[in-house]
Design a protein with these regions (language model features):
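A conserved short coil-to-beta-strand element within the FAD-binding core of flavoproteins
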Residues: 65-79
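Central helical "cap/lid" subdomain
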Residues: 76, 80-122, 143, 149-156, ...
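Short FAD-binding loop at a beta-strand-to-alpha-helix junction that anchors the flavin cofactor
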Residues: 130-142
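Small-molecule pocket liners
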Residues: 5, 104-108, 127, 136
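Flavin (FAD/FMN) cofactor-binding and adjacent substrate-gating region
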Residues: 1-60, 186
C-alpha cells in the first residue's frame, strides 16, 4: 500500500472509489501545488508488474493452468475451455478491431523516493510519480496514434518539468533510465 495525492485544476466531487480504499481525505489548500485548486490524498495498492507478472504466471501454473505464447491468426485456432485474450494492440488484426490504437507512453526511472505518489490525471497535463520497491517511475505521456519506440529527450524534459511542478524536491541527478511502451487505447 502506498499513499498518493491527486491534484486537480477545478473543484470536483470526490471519486466514487473513495469509500473502497484504506484511506481518503481532501487536501488542505497549503498542500496543493501552484496551478491547482483541489485535490485528495489516498492509500491504495501499487502493483509492480515486473514482480507481479512472474508471480501470476507461477500461480496459474500451480493451479494447473498453462500459458502458451504463439502466433495466432484466428481466435478459433486456440484450444481450451477458457482463453484469456491479452493481445493488446494486436486486437487490430486478430479481432478486426480498427478502433484499437496505440497510446505511446514514455517514462523515466529515478533512484529517489518521493514518499508518496503525485498525480495529475488530466489528459493534457498527465503527470505522475509512482514509487516502487526499486525505483520511482516518473511520467508521462499518452500520445495516441504514435508508434514511435525511441526515448525522446524533449519528452524527458517535458516530463521532468511537469513532475517538478508537483514535486519540487526532484533530483535530476538521480535519473537511472527510462523506457517507452505502447498501450492499447480507443476513442470511445
Amino acid at each position: 500500500m502506498r499513499d498518493g495525492r491527486e491534484y486537480l485544476r477545478e473543484v470536483v466531487e470526490p471519486p466514487a472509489w473513495r469509500d473502497d480504499i484504506a484511506a481518503f481525505s481532501i487536501l488542505d489548500q497549503y498542500e496543493i501545488p501552484d496551478g491547482y485548486v483541489f485535490g485528495w490524498q489516498f492509500r491504495a495498492p501499487v502493483i509492480e508488474m515486473p514482480l507481479y507478472m512472474p508471480w501470476l504466471r507461477s500461480r496459474v501454473e500451480s493451479l494447473g493452468g498453462t500459458l502458451r505464447q504463439s502466433f495466432v491468426e484466428d481466435l478459433s485456432e486456440v484450444p481450451g475451455e477458457v482463453v484469456v485474450n491479452c493481445v493488446g494492440l494486436g486486437a487490430r488484426e486478430l479481432c478486426q478491431d480498427d478502433e484499437v490504437r496505440p497510446a505511446r507512453g514514455q517514462v523515466i526511472f529515478l533512484d529517489q523516493d518521493p514518499g508518496i505518489g503525485h498525480f495529475d490525471q488530466q489528459p493534457e497535463t498527465l503527470t505522475y510519480t509512482i514509487p516502487r520497491s526499486d525505483v520511482t517511475v516518473l511520467g508521462g505521456t499518452a500520445q495516441v496514434d504514435d508508434w514511435g519506440m525511441d526515448i525522446r529527450p524533449e519528452e524527458n524534459e517535458l516530463i521532468l518539468d511537469k513532475v517538478e511542478a508537483l514535486w519540487p524536491e526532484l533530483d535530476r541527478s538521480k535519473i537511472i533510465g527510462g523506457t517507452v511502451g505502447l498501450r492499447p487505447s480507443r476513442s470511445e
